[in-house]
């Protein structure tokens, strides 16, 4: 496999899959807070219709070198554009992209990322950056947010009876307790 470093023109490479992990209040794991992985990438992804609605959280060790993460790293080293990284690729936030942030923050680790990652995408690098959101406690109700990340939006959903435990099972008591216990 021909690995292409950013210094060789790779514009899609990001250090997040080598250094960072994100965990949502529902214990879903992602590349970062802005990544757009499809639901089928996650065994514990419980907020879509494409699941068994069973709570199966994934530990960091299970997640770090799973098939999805290895595929992401492999494709990034090849310079491929990833649909998971649409927010950065298309500058959807109208600001500096997270990729630039990660690559600047960990620029001294780029060579290590390439050296420690085999052709399958498996890496021996360890996570050093954690964005763990243990609950959705937030008193804001920003328009772009929702009940997954804002307790204010969750309260409004409950008050207006607009939530459905089939589609938002994390709001139901038994599952809510399991999530708290996992964290």
Model-derived features: positions:
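Leucine-rich repeat
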Residues: 171-175
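Short, flexible hinge/linker loops that cap or flank conserved catalytic cores
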Residues: 123-124, 136, 180
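Canonical Radical SAM [4Fe-4S] cluster-binding loop centered on the CxxxCxxC motif
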Residues: 31-39, 131-170
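Accessory C-terminal segments flanking Radical SAM cores
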Residues: 2-131, 149-152
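Short, intrinsically disordered, charge-balanced linker/junction segments flanking boundaries
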Residues: 176-183
């Amino acid at each position: 496999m021909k690995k292409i470093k950013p210094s060789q023109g790779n514009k899609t490479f990001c250090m997040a899959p080598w250094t960072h992990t994100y965990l949502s209040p529902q214990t879903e794991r992602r590349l970062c807070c802005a990544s757009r992985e499809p639901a089928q990438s996650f065994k514990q992804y419980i907020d879509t219709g494409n699941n068994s609605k069973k709570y199966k959280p994934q530990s960091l060790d299970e997640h770090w070198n799973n098939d999805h993460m290895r595929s992401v790293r492999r494709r990034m080293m090849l310079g491929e554009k990833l649909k998971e990284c649409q927010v950065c690729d298309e500058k959807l936030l109208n600001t500096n992209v997270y990729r630039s942030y990660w690559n600047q923050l960990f620029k001294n680790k780029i060579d290590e990322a390439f050296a420690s990652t085999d052709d399958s995408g498996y890496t021996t690098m360890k996570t050093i950056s954690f964005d763990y959101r243990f609950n959705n406690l937030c008193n804001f109700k920003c328009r772009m947010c929702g009940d997954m990340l804002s307790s204010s939006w969750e309260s409004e959903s409950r008050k207006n009876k607009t939530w459905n435990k089939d589609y938002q099972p994390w709001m139901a008591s038994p599952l809510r307790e399991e999530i708290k216990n996992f964290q």
